[in-house]
């Protein structure tokens, strides 16, 4: 820690903080130092803070009142994100990183936009792939594909997170999830909604970039695969979009994004979240020719932290909060309509069994 490094305060010290953000910050000790860690579980707060020589607390207000905390990172459960972003803005912090989603409704997002404008506080949302050098390189070179793409595919195959969390660090505590009765229409709808707002939301901003008519969302089909995940086929404006994920016991994760047009196509393969393995690799194909961008030396998590430092120091322009609201609005639309479709199909299947 030096006077030139930026002081970080972390709200929520669960697996994402322990296995992703702290290892990322350990690569950026010339830029950041962790000042204080807050968690509602005092044992977790103390354990995680001890790893980085930081103070700990169970009180959000105590962390926000700490003048050495210049940047606030919000890794708490989703339902607390909006109020904590607002509180951090009002506390006069230099920049805020909020894990996705940064709000659970459009009204909450609009309140954040108002407060951020009043306090002039820059905010970024932890959609890490939007900061990945592979994605950024693709943006510079995809040309008219952004308008000519007719098919978008976004796919995740995800082994159990704890396997990779344990490789990355010693996790102090994990939330426990009860078994779910997926034959209950409300439970099935909740699983789809949670999957989209918890997992798909990572790259829905990438999908939205290719879908200018993002408010025109039609769910063509929606399936809840075993053991967990989602398979959603959408029509977004004039684009066909497939968003899918499956949680499996396989060894290798796969996280891909594709945009396909008549004359060109893009495929991006992202590196695993829990491994400091460099950036995504983007391949743009135009006829028989291929252009490859990446992998670069760091991933999207490190990219978002680098950008956060520039925001705090005022060396880059803040992101347009309106765009963050549009990203959230699109995610909510997909989640709500997909949940409704699964609720209806599950109820219909139950009625058929009972007949």
Regions found by a protein language model. Name each.
Residues 103-172:
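A contiguous active-site-proximal alpha/beta segment in oxidoreductase catalytic domains
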Residues 191-192, 198-274, 295, 302-315, ...:
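Contiguous beta-strand/loop segments that form the cofactor/metal-binding neighborhood of enzyme cores
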Residues 144-185, 216-224, 242-245:
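NAD(P)-dependent dehydrogenases' Rossmann-like dinucleotide-binding region
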Residues 2-5, 71-73, 307-355:
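C-terminal helix-rich "cap/oligomerization" subdomain common to oxidoreductases
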Residues 52-115:
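Beta-loop-alpha module in the N-terminal Rossmann-like domain of NAD(P)-dependent dehydrogenases
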Residues 126-133, 164-214:
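Mid-domain beta-loop-alpha active-site segment that forms a flexible
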Residues 1-52:
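N-terminal Rossmann-like dinucleotide-binding module
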Residues 58, 97-98, 123-125, 268:
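Hydrophobic residues in well-ordered beta-strands that form the structural core
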């Amino acid at each position: 820690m030096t006077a030139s490094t930026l002081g970080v305060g972390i709200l929520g010290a669960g697996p994402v903080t322990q296995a992703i953000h702290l290892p990322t910050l350990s690569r950026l000790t010339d830029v950041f130092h962790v000042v204080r860690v807050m968690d509602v579980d005092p044992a977790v707060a103390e354990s995680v803070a001890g790893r980085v020589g930081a103070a700990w607390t169970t009180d959000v207000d105590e962390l926000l009142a700490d003048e050495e905390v210049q940047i606030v990172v919000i890794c708490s459960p989703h339902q607390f994100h909006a109020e904590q972003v607002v509180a951090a803005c009002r506390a006069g912090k230099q920049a805020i990183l909020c894990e996705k989603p940064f709000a659970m409704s459009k009204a909450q997002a609009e309140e954040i936009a108002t407060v951020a404008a009043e306090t002039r506080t820059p905010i970024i949302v932890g959609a890490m792939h939007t900061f990945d050098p592979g994605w950024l390189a693709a943006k510079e070179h995809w040309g008219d594909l952004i308008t000519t793409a007719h098919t978008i595919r976004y796919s995740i195959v995800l082994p159990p997170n704890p396997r990779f969390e344990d490789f990355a660090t010693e996790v102090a505590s994990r939330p426990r999830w009860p078994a779910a009765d997926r034959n209950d229409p409300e439970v099935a709808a909740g699983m789809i909604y949670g999957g989209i707002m918890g997992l798909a939301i990572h790259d829905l901003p990438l999908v939205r970039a290719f879908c200018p008519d993002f408010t025109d969302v039609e769910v063509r089909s929606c399936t809840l695969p075993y053991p967990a995940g989602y398979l959603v086929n959408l029509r977004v404006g004039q684009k066909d979009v497939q968003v899918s994920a499956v949680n499996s016991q396989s060894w290798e994760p796969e996280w891909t994004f594709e945009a396909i047009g008549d004359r060109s196509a893009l495929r991006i393969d992202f590196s695993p979240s829990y491994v400091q393995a460099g950036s995504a690799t983007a391949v743009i194909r135009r006829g028989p020719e291929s252009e490859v961008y990446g992998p670069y030396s760091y991933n999207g998590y490190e990219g978002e932290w680098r950008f956060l430092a520039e925001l705090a120091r005022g060396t880059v322009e803040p992101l347009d909060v309106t765009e963050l609201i549009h990203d959230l609005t699109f995610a909510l639309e997909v989640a709500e309509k997909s949940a409704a479709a699964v609720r209806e199909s599950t109820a219909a299947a139950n009625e058929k069994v009972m007949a």
